[in-house]
Amino acid sequence: EKAFSMLQLGSPKKKEVSIANLRLLTALYGDWIKNELKENPQMQESSFQATGKSIIEKCLDSLRRMNEGIDLIEKDENAFKAFTFMNQSMYLQRSITAYSKDCGRGIPCSLSDYMKDNKEKGIEQDHSEWRPFQIAFILLNIKGLIDPESDERNIVDLLYFPTGGGKTEAYLGLIAFIIAYRRLTSD
């Protein structure tokens, strides 16, 4: 199974597995901070120590925010529903993209072909997954999106990768999440 499968993360029946996979991401990130940053001799050099300390503190803060996002998904039913909706929406979008590419080339197909295993056409039902940085970005922004009292509302997080790196999906994921969350919680 893919750890960050949009199909799996979009399944309300797979909450425990989804939470465990998200927690694994933050555990591995925490290990990376410890092993690659804190214990990196270059971070201890006097000419880099202040900058190194600042980088480590920002990484630890991001880790904290990601864990808070997971906690909210785990404990707040509306956050969980919004998270599954986000994944279902992104999965459907990726299915439609694959469908459009093939049908645009004159290949006979139907959208349902892209939402189930179809060995004849070389299609897997579980065809789309988040990259770790995308799901991490979503997790670290959840609290600031849903808690009107959160100090995180004063933070602006931007992604930068060259074209084709996956920024748009991460931003669209957050948009789908907050649309669903607001719909679920509006009076």
Where are these regions (language model features)?
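Non-catalytic protein-protein interaction scaffold segments in large eukaryotic complex-forming proteins
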Residues: E1-L9
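Conserved SF1/SF2 helicase motif Ia
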Residues: D151-V156, F177-D187
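Short, solvent-exposed loop/turn and secondary-structure capping segments
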Residues: A98-K101, S150-R153, Y171-L172, L184
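Short, well-ordered amphipathic alpha-helices
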Residues: L139-I146, L174-R183
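Walker A/P-loop
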Residues: E152-I175
